[in-house]
Amino acid sequence: MSPPRSALYVFLFTFLAVLYSLTVPLFEGNDESWHYAYVWHIAEGKGLPRQPPDQYPHLARQEASQPPLYYLLAAALTRWVPQEDLLALYARENPFPTLLPVAHRDNQNHYVHTDAERFPYRGAALAIHMVRLLSVLFGAGTVWGTYRLARKLFPQEGWVAAGAAMMVALTPGFLFTSGLVNNDALAACIATWALVVLLNRRERKERQEKQNLCALCDLCGEILSGLLLGAAALTKLSGLLLWPFAALVLGVYHEDTKTRSLKNFSFVSSRLRGFILIFGVALAVCGWWYLRNWRLYGDPTGLAAMLPLVGHREMGFGLMDFFQTEARLVWLSYWAVFGWFNLAAPGWVYRVYALLTALGVAGLVLLIVRAVRQKRWGDLAGVGYLALWSLIVAVGLVRWTLTTGGSQGRLLYPAVGAHATLLALGWAQLVPARARRWLFPALGGVLLALALWLPFGVIRPAYARPAPLTAAEVADRVSQPADVRFGESIYLLGYQVDAKEVRPGETFWVTLCWQAEGPVAEDYFVSLSLLTADGLTAARKVTHPGLGTFPTSLWTPGVAFCDRYPLTVRDTVPTTAAGVLAVGLTTFTERLPGYNKEGWRLGDAFRFPGPSISVPDSGPILDYRWGREVALVGYRLERAVLAPGEELDLTLYWRALRPLGGPRSATVQVLRDGGYKIAQVDLPLNLEPGEVWADHRKMTLAADAPPGVYELKVAVYDPTGGGALPVYAGGRAFPAGGLLPLWEIRVREVSQDHQMDVRFGKMIRLLGYTLSSDDRVEPGDVLTVTLYWELLAQNGRPANSFVHLLGTTFNPVSGNFLWGQGDKRPPINWWEVGRIYEDVYAFQVASNAPPGEYWLEVGWWDPSTQERYSPQILKGEGSVLSEWDSLLLTEIAIP
């Protein structure tokens, strides 16, 4: 069996890349919408975009700072296509996309897609697919160039060249990237062919010396080398990395192709003419672009204008931080991370590539050992050639990552041909030469199966809408029917919770089934929360229905469907708590009211039992690290629901990871979005390595703090002016500023005339009351009492409230009970935990009521058992327990 020719792999790659391109919805690749905006800006005759976009309007954002070669080619290809509908594509942006790679379906789409994008393509969809095909051609050129590169370096290893081309053609990440609108495929193609041409030029130089060939061949090679170097720098800034590589390869040594030994390390002066020609041509190709940047931004690279848009890396992020937190993401995304860097493959896929990589590296080590022993310097030179370019590209990626957050494997694709050749060379060393004819086809079968499965098994399901269901199918998918209406026409048909108990950091799934009875003009989001007994949010998901793919305006009336929503419990939940799930429909400005089947209004959310949250008695176990110095390993919070002016009691547990790099202080703040702060305490950290310190703090909330939910946040900073240290957890960096959201603090409303704290069982609390008259009413008058209740927890049992006016014998007095809100509002099991409710009752005192002292009696009872909930009086004076297990609220005098 002879090795396949390069044409086979070029064809195979083209087929697969087109398959990926057609499978991925428009704009669902890294920055694809911004890359295409660059193309469109040129195609519309507006020239090259300038920065910043708020001053020179365009939609390309930071991508407008990219060198223009790819975009000029794409604009020339699509200039004739009408694209009046393009802005409608940009208008359908998903406000809640997933930002990190996850292997389950969850808002991977950055845009909402409609049938207007389907085949046959027209307008903007046609133009975008045309540019995607252009990228596919550049990717195919990379496959062909990889084959030529391997054949040039290792001409006796035919299966190595075939294996290298096969590896590039079947790498899912490269297939995905080459099927999108971006400049990565062109950058990879140019870099790969530059490696080939640089080899050709060295060989032509030697043939000229030995065979006295005409200098024209060498001149053409130098011009072609310069064209490729210039094109690389005009495609992507990383293309400039080819320049020092070319100088090093051409200037330091040349290779004798007959003996394949390193024999000449002379200074590059003998090749000064060639250098001037090569780099002169390169500058002629790309120099105008860098001069333009210098004139516009004072920086030839344009980074001075780009970095404010893409964002600078947090202060203190170093090389060790990269390897500890983001190198793994580079590895994953090199092989198979899709979407906007947010759609991962199953874990076993990466284990396959890890095994293949490990085998390739082991084989390379074996090759190097054998080559040294056998003095095969040519093989070592070939490995060094590829390894040097791979190292330069990797250093460039790390340098970029230390500047801004851009840790993605696609940035290594300029060296994809070198990587594939090295891996194929390593695999070939692990088997006898005769077995390679079976090894590479077997590996190709595995890689082909993976590359074919991923579009259908991972990519397509992530962007699919929920399937329509019959009533019977809905009943099979839910454990509890709901029949709750939101607004005028949207119904929640039922639900199912997949877990009964969860721990901090765990993800569980909730199934909700929906149906619209009429057209819905507005796009409403699903807001699903897991609440603790204090009504604080332990987990939350806000999304378009269909996990981002099926906005309500696209629903068909009368068609039901079910969604499965992932909820990840915050790892900072402070204590074990019963969980209550709350679901509602909302926009950015309004929340739809909910109604049960009896027509009772449920507020703006439907509540149903959720899983309990199990937290160790010692508190949550954490590992949040500021820099590489200090870790927060746990905390304890005494109370999370407080009144203005009350004291927050907090203990933080710190551990020093190494000697501190200078003075360090920790700040604890209670604040809202926008920075409105109601409490702050700063204390210095004095820790020895390995020591765990219990940092006990008491903070008084502002006396005028408005009621609502606030964030409790923690940060470590340099008090001498160095700023906050970056904070990391599990490889994830938090936003700049180093503030870690720890938990929520609810500030309750205090507006009652008479404040108290009386609990009825463990479920509800009376916070206070107001009376229409102080403590005196006339016979025949109307007495109105307003009670302020707070729900502490949901236990799933019914409860009704009551209010009586008792006489001196503690029996209800005669008179007319006019009305009570407790008889008209929804049952308590619809209440929201932590929310304060007003309960208003009115009595008309009998006209013949005898004078005397009367009591107002309040309480709660269970209608299923007829038993009352005993009050526990925690605050207030003059209150006593009645013989009926109720609270005697206050005395009322009738003269």
Task: Outline where the language-model segments fall.
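Specific aromatic-rich, kink-prone transmembrane helix
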Residues: 141-148, 186-201, 224-229, 418, ...
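Transmembrane-helix signature of polytopic, membrane-embedded enzymes
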Residues: 6-8, 102-118, 146-170, 189
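Membrane-lumen/periplasm interface segments of multi-pass, membrane-embedded glycan/lipid transferases
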Residues: 294-370, 484-498
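Interfacial juxtamembrane loops and adjacent helix segments
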Residues: 41-134, 310-317, 321-324, 340-348
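Perimembrane helix-loop-helix junctions
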Residues: 197-203, 210-223, 242-283, 372
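Transmembrane alpha-helix segments characteristic
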Residues: 12, 162-164, 257, 283, ...
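C-terminal luminal/periplasmic domains and tails of membrane-associated envelope-modifying transferases
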Residues: 456-895
